[in-house]
């Protein structure tokens, strides 16, 4: 009997045995029952293993023994059986994991030890990787000073210069900036390495270099080897996993789907081969493994599974099970939290088989306990299974720091220390620096090499302190025993023969091409389902347009009696082709939005580009049938096209091919452009060329010989020819109207009048061309994604000082003042000694002398504050009866001048809510209770003038410098009587205080893209508020997302601010000991919006600890433990339930509460001789000054925005030259109607395309600035009108230049009549048309929540404006029920003005004897006498859209708080 039969027999024995056992069981003695049943089970288990072992090895590794049945999947009541692990369902996988790793914290280590034990028993070595790097150097090319600022002028000169460099005719003015300098070291397997270093020290560059992922924008030298093998000998991307600090994921996929897809692409590595060998050796040694471990290893080693048990395991150890089936989300789609997203980024690489991990800042947004759990799980994996890991962390808590074996400390691109964690303090003590008792070692290491922080750690009081440079540390480390040991080890090359054959990956991809294609197909289907709204909206949009088209070109109004009426049918066909083409436009955005994730996965070698591009094409075909069907089926017979059913289906078939071609074209453009602004411009450009040379706007005979090649390669030409031939060669047109010598049918006459080939075969030529273009564009799309790199976001420019300092640090020279941070002028943060304080300020003058500008210290007290919102519909649906949800429940407290208060609590406690209520930033909800400012009731108008609010998201205009941001804030927020010089002195003082002097001319940039780092951005946020000279400052999480040193810099800024006598309140999340103890008082809240402690912290948090330890049952704090962490742990809801207490009640019965109440009462009474805050006007500055300031900032922003302005000028100039050459000399002579149509075609195409380009490209610019506007308006800087004024007015000069450049080039080349009046009329209409298009785009942003919706809303009107412009169908031929819209369509008025100003007064007769003027009046309905009115209406449209933008900005606030 074969082995499979044996397994069947075992299963039947199990069934029969159980029945027999049941019948006799009642007669047995109790103890015998248990002994028999367990004996029987053992026998059956043995039989199963025996049967399993008889299987061939290949089959044996695919099958495992698992519990069967049971409702919970745990196998209860179902017995065990042999299962094919390839088909394990979610329930079986979950049950298996539940048995192996029930609680990740407790069971993971035991589980890994079982895995290791199984492998060790048969003597299999696990592959390990030792990474060595020797003399690693990296340099970046940067522009120094102002030449690096991205102004329109710089962008043009820099582009020309780079072209000159490439040709070798111009010298390279860029300078090199060192990033890494001569770093060498060894990363050992089975050891956890922590990478530390201040911001900009080169941590990311080092990790990228070690992972073999260094970009081509850096000049690198040196050697990195894995087990002695150079990078070229294996595939580093698959051997090592680099986990980026940027979280790039597809928002529409769930966490589980994201990880499962990643696991599918990365494959299982050598797991299957190892398992086969393991199984063979176990069989030979007659070893029976643990059934669950066997099942897990087999399931994890199977490639090609849609869901792998390893994915479920990673979800568990990363704590992502709770959100496994939640969408990841993005800025448009609500999803998981930032911390969870960070863990998904980590999990995405952990599910793969890589044995070396390089992890960049994986703890951002995570609380310390989650970080500890993740790092601990990684540590267990590395130690037990022999992995290699280098992890950089921002603010590791002491308990997380202690999990690491080795430390690498980087500073200024050099390794200051590398080696065992235990020896690091010894090294620094040998240099004279000591870590204080209450200081985290990681925090100490990040600060000890910094000029500003070093002095406080100097421990040799017998010697005077002298700044020790990084170079001195580096050379001292080389003679330190750890440094010598590393140098000695590096001197002996790694023995390549000792490298495990499975350690290094040599195949390019982790799975076969067929499997990767299948994975991408499955993902694309999933995304199409999730994005179904886009396709439904697209279809709906097409339906709406088809309804307009069929009622506009209505069959009762459509005659077949002349060539002119045939032209109207041609217009209807042209419009149909254009709409089907435009329908594919949304592919552009869908492609570009997915590219960042694609590039990440491509570069990690998840899959080749072809496996991504094929599904994105093939799977869209079924949708095309629906979309095109909707248009053709609705319009064909209603418009009255040829009644032959064959012609109908041929039109449908051709439209399908056109839609496929258009979708492929836009996918290719998106893939080649890789950026939404460039893609939009490029797509508009391609559409324009294809359209103008497509044979409808300009007849073939009129195309100049130098452009005829463009006619032959235009897909629109083939589409237009094919669809025209299909209609006009049909039965309905097969009649002779005006008998001519040739007796041509009417259809042929119409085709010839428009220059179309009157041959039936052109239908199939056109159809074949559409298929050919579709294949070509998809091939080009694949090539673009295979070879193009994403745009770099590296810094292109640095200041002269920064470069000088970088170079000086390399040489060990000292630049600038070092003794910035020695003594202390405030209460020390640590144990009271001077050396212990991190957040200090040596400059006694700054804190003691007061600022240049005086301010009035103010206190803020609040009593019984309640805040509620309308009950969310989801909660009402769950049966909650209340109408309101209360978020703050009677909170009372006070904040005083010169006192730094921390506002803390777990997530959901209401910290930010309370701060928003007190600061008056809430845009909805219901507020009750009293809030007083120095005893007077708070009035929001005056309060905004004396308060500052530093938001958690650092929102600033990206195109201005640090100094300009501060100047703008001070200009609008300081009183009018402060003169310009005093204002500038005050800004200088604030920059000194906030340590921004070195960044004075740095561009702010966009977060995560370019410009300032997170920590610099935080300091700018604080400075922007400080220059307003406020008395009260609110700060929302000023240290989140920062490393320890950056957080210390920010906190030093905050402390300096308090020392000037201001009232400062900060919400803070998971602070380190020294940051926490920098605060004077704490206001602690619990979930649900109630306070549980409000009072002083005391020396070493003694007051806080005393208060909570006095509550019965609360556990005592351990020595050296962070009081902030302890406090949050002992006050959780779980603790309340365990102790049976309510911390809020305890607080309200305490003596502390009574003291606080008395203080609130005291602060609620105005001081004698004081007066309430009063300002004569709502804003500091007059409306005129506000307008000037807003215009000043917009001017800077626009000048420094080349992607917007330089691209628009370039695009306009190129189009002007193209139009000039295409329509060369066609405007001068009008001898027949086609000449007029050609000239009008040039006007129509330019107006529509340049106008639409202006409209789409302004939207992202306005959307970014609007976010800044919300913050600045809330801060009381200006009203809505000055902002709208600045945004509108700054467009005028740029549009004027754009229209003038276009007008001069085109007017001269097309050869319109050279009279001053006609030229200036032409210019006038172009200027105001481009303005109203631009203002229309701005208005769409103003009326919608974000720019994605704005682009959808605005694009809905493009098609309608196109249709009613008067070119496709002239106004007199429009049915009466639609004629009103001809007067409401701005483009129709523009064409009216342009045509009538050029041709409306020409009396010269055409070939048929009709004067041009009469033809214009009869055919188009354009009268020259109306010219003045037309001009007024066109200008009025610009004014109307600008006014609506201003109105929308004033009335709508889409920011929900």
Curated annotation (Swiss-Prot):
As for membrane topology, the entry says:
Multi-pass membrane protein
* TM ranges: 533-553, 565-585, 621-641, 653-673, 677-697, 706-726, 765-785, 1209-1229, 1244-1264, 1292-1312, 1319-1339, 1349-1369, 1380-1400, 1429-1449
Mind telling me which Pfam families this protein's record contains? ABC2_membrane (PF01061), ABC2_membrane_7 (PF19055), ABC_tran (PF00005), ABC_trans_N (PF14510), PDR_assoc (PF08370)
Kindly state which keywords UniProt assigns to this record, in alphabetical order.
Answer: ATP-binding, Membrane, Nucleotide-binding, Repeat, Transmembrane, Transmembrane helix, Transport
> Where does the protein principally reside?
membrane
Query: Could you say which residues bind ATP 2 here?
Result: 905-912
The record's subcellular location field reads: Membrane
Record Gene3D superfamilies: P-loop containing nucleotide triphosphate hydrolases (3.40.50.300)
The ranges of region (Disordered) come to 14-43, 821-841
Q: Where is the ABC transmembrane type-2 domain?
A: 515-728, 1185-1399
Cellular component terms per the entry's GO annotation: membrane
Which residues of the sequence carry a binding annotation for ATP 1? 197-204
Task: State the source organism's domain of life.
Answer: Eukaryota
Q: Which InterPro entries match?
A: AAA+_ATPase (IPR003593), ABC2_TM (IPR013525), ABC_trans_N (IPR029481), ABC_transporter-like_ATP-bd (IPR003439), ABCG_dom (IPR043926), ABCG_PDR_2 (IPR034003), P-loop_NTPase (IPR027417), PDR_assoc (IPR013581)
Biased composition of type Basic and acidic residues is found at 28-39
The ABC transporter domain extends over: 164-437, 860-1112
Cite the GO molecular-function annotations of the record. Answer: ABC-type transporter activity; ATP binding; ATP hydrolysis activity
Q: Per its database record, what is this protein's job?
A: May be a general defense protein.
Give the family, as the similarity comment puts it.
Answer: Belongs to the ABC transporter superfamily. ABCG family. PDR (TC 3.A.1.205) subfamily.
Kindly give the PANTHER family that the UniProt entry links to this protein: ABC TRANSPORTER G FAMILY MEMBER 39-LIKE (PTHR48040:SF35), PLEIOTROPIC DRUG RESISTANCE PROTEIN 1-LIKE ISOFORM X1 (PTHR48040)
Report the protein name in the record.
ABC transporter G family member 36
Q: Which organism is it from?
A: Oryza sativa subsp. japonica
Q: Upper taxonomic classification of the species?
A: Eukaryota, Viridiplantae, Streptophyta, Embryophyta, Tracheophyta
Q: Which gene encodes it?
A: ABCG36
């Amino acid at each position: 009997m074969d082995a499979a039969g044996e397994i069947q027999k075992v299963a039947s024995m199990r069934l029969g045995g159980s029945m027999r056992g049941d019948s006799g069981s009642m007669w047995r003695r109790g103890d015998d029952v248990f002994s028999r049943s367990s004996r029987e089970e053992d026998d059956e288990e043995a039989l199963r293993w025996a049967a399993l072992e008889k299987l061939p090895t290949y089959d044996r590794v695919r099958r495992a023994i698992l519990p069967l049945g049971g409702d919970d999947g745990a196998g209860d009541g179902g017995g065990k059986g042999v299962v094919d692990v390839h088909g394990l369902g979610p329930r079986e996988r979950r049950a298996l994991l539940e048995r192996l790793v029930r609680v990740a914290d407790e069971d993971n280590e035991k589980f890994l030890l079982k895995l290791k034990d199984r492998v060790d028993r048969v003597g299999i070595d696990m592959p390990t990787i030792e990474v060595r790097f020797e003399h690693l150097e990296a340099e970046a090319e940067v522009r120094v000073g102002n030449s690096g600022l991205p102004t329109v002028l710089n962008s043009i000169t820099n582009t020309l210069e780079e072209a000159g460099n490439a040709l070798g005719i111009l010298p390279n003015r860029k300078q090199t900036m060192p990033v890494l300098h001569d770093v060498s070291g060894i990363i050992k397997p089975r050891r956890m390495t922590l990478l530390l270093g201040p911001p900009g020290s080169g941590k990311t560059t080092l990790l990228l270099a070690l992972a073999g992922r260094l970009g081509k924008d850096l000049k690198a030298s040196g050697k990195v080897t894995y087990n002695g093998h150079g990078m070229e000998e294996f595939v580093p991307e698959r051997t090592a996993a680099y986990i980026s600090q940027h979280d790039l994921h597809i928002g529409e996929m769930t966490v589980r789907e994201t990880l499962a897809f990643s696991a599918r692409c990365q494959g299982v590595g050598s797991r299957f081969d190892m398992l086969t060998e393991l199984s063979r050796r176990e069989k030979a040694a007659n070893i029976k493994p643990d059934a669950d471990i066997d099942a897990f290893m087999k399931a994890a080693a199977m490639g090609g599974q849609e869901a792998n048990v390893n994915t479920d395991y990673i979800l568990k150890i990363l704590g992502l099970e709770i959100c496994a089936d939640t969408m990841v989300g993005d800025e448009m789609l609500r999803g998981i939290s930032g911390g969870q997203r960070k863990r998904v980024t980590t999990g995405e690489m952990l599910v793969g088989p890589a044995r070396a991990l390089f992890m960049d800042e994986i703890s951002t947004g995570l609380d310390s306990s989650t970080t500890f759990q993740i790092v601990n799980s990684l540590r267990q994996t590395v130690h037990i299974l022999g992995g290699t890991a280098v992890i950089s962390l921002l603010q590791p808590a002491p308990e997380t720091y202690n999990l690491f074996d080795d430390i690498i400390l980087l500073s200024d691109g050099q390794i200051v220390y590398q080696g065992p964690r235990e020896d690091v303090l010894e090294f620094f003590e040998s240099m004279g620096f000591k870590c204080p008792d209450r200081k985290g070692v990681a925090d100490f290491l990040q600060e000890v090499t910094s000029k500003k922080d070093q002095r406080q750690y100097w421990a040799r009081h017998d010697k005077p302190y002298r700044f020790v440079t990084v170079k001195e540390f580096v050379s001292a480390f080389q003679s330190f025993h750890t440094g010598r040991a590393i140098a000695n080890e590096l001197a002996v090359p790694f023995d390549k023969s000792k490298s495990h054959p499975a350690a290094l990956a040599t195949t390019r991809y982790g799975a076969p091409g067929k499997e990767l294609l299948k994975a991408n197909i499955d993902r694309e289907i999933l995304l199409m389902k999730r994005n179904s709204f886009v396709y439904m909206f697209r279809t709906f949009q097409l339906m709406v347009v088809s309804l307009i088209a069929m009622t506009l070109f209505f069959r009762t109004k459509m005659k077949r009696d002349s060539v002119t009426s045939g032209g109207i049918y041609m217009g209807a066909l042209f419009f149909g082709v254009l709409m089907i083409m435009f329908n594919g436009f949304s592919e552009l955005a869908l492609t570009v939005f997915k590219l960042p994730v694609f590039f990440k996965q491509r570069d990690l070698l998840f899959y080749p580009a072809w496996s991504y591009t094929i599904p994105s094409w093939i799977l869209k075909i079924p949708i095309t049938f629906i979309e095109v069907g909707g248009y053709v089926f609705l319009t064909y017979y209603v418009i009255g096209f040829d009644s032959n059913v064959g012609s109908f289906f041929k039109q449908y078939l051709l439209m399908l091919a056109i839609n496929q071609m258009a979708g492929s074209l836009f996918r290719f453009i998106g893939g080649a452009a890789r950026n939404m602004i460039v893609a939009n411009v490029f797509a508009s450009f391609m559409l324009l060329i294809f359209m103008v040379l497509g044979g409808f706007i300009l007849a073939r005979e009129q195309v100049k010989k130098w452009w005829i090649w463009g006619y032959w390669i235009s897909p629109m030409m083939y589409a237009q020819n094919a669809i025209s031939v299909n209609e006009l060669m049909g039965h309905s047109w097969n009649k002779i109207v005006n008998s001519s010598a040739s007796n041509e049918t009417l259809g042929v006459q119409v085709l010839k009048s428009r220059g179309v080939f009157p041959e039936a075969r052109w239908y199939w030529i056109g159809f074949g061309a559409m298929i050919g273009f579709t294949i070509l564009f998809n091939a080009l799309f694949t090539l673009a994604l295979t070879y193009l790199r994403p745009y770099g976001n590296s810094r292109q420019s640095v200041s002269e000082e920064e470069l000088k300092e970088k170079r000086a640090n390399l040489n060990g020279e000292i630049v600038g003042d070092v003794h910035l941070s020695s003594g202390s002028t405030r209460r020390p943060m640590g144990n009271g000694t001077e050396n212990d304080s991190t957040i200090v300020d040596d400059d006694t003058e700054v804190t003691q002398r007061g600022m240049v500008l005086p301010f009035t210290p103010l206190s803020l007290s609040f009593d019984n504050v309640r805040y509620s919102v309308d009950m969310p519909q989801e909660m009402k649906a769950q049966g909650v009866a209340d109408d309101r949800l209360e978020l703050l429940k009677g909170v009372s407290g006070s904040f005083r001048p010169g006192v730094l208060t921390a506002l803390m609590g777990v997530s959901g406690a209401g910290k930010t809510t309370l701060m928003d209520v007190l600061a008056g930033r809430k845009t909805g909800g219901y507020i009750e209770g009293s809030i007083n400012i120095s005893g007077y009731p708070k009035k929001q108008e005056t309060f905004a003038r004396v308060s500052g609010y530093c938001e958690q998201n650092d929102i600033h205009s990206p195109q201005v410098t640090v100094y300009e941001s501060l100047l703008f804030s001070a200009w609008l927020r300081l009183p009018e009587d402060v003169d310009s010089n005093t204002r500038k002195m005050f800004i200088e003082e604030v920059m000194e205080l906030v340590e921004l002097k070195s960044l004075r001319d740095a561009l702010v940039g966009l977060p995560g893209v370019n410009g300032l780092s997170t920590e610099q951005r935080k300091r700018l946020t604080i400075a922007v508020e400080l220059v307003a000279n406020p008395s009260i400052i609110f700060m929302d999480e000023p240290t989140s997302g920062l490393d320890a040193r950056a957080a210390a810099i920010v906190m030093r800024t905050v402390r300096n601010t308090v020392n000037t006598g201001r009232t400062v309140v900060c919400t803070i999340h998971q602070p380190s000991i020294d940051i926490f103890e920098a605060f004077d008082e704490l206001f602690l809240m619990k979930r649900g919006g109630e306070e549980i402690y409000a009072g002083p912290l005391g020396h070493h948090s003694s007051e806080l600890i005393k208060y909570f330890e006095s509550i019965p049952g609360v556990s005592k704090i351990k020595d050296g433990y962070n009081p902030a962490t302890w406090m949050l742990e002992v006050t959780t809801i779980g603790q309340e339930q365990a102790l049976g207490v309510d911390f809020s009640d305890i607080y309200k019965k305490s003596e502390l509460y009574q003291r606080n109440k008395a203080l609130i009462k005291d602060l609620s009474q105005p001081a004698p001789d004081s007066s309430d805050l009063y300002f004569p006007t709502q804003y500091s500055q007059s409306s005129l000054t506000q307008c000037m300031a807003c215009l000043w900032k917009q001017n800077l922003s626009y000048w420094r925005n080349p992607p917007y302005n330089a691209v628009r000028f370039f695009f306009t100039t190129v189009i002007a030259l193209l139009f000039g050459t295409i329509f060369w000399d066609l405007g001068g002579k009008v001898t027949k109607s086609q000449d007029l149509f050609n000239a009008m075609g040039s006007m129509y195409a330019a107006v529509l395309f340049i106008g639409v380009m202006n409209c789409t490209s302004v939207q992202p610019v306005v959307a970014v600035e609007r976010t800044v506007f919300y913050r600045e308006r809330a801060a009381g800087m200006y009203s809505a009108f000055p902002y709208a004024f600045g945004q509108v007015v700054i467009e005028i000069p740029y549009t004027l230049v754009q229209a003038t450049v276009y007008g001069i080039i085109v007017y001269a080349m097309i050869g319109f009549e050279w009279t001053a009046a006609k030229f200036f009329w032409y210019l006038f209409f172009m200027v105001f048309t481009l303005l109203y298009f631009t203002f229309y785009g701005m208005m769409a942003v103003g009326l919608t929540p974000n720019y994605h919706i704005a682009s959808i809303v605005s694009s809905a009107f493009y098609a309608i404006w196109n249709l009613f412009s008067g070119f496709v169908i002239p106004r007199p031929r429009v049915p009466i029920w639609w004629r009103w819209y001809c007067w409401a369509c701005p483009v129709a008025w523009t064409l009216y003005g342009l045509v009538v100003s050029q041709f409306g007064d020409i009396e010269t007769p055409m070939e048929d004897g009709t004067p041009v003027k009469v033809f214009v009046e009869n055919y188009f309905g354009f009268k020259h006498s109306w010219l003045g009115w037309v001009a007024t209406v066109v200008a009025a449209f610009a004014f109307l859209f600008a006014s609506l933008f201003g109105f929308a900005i004033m009335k709508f606030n889409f920011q929900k708080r």
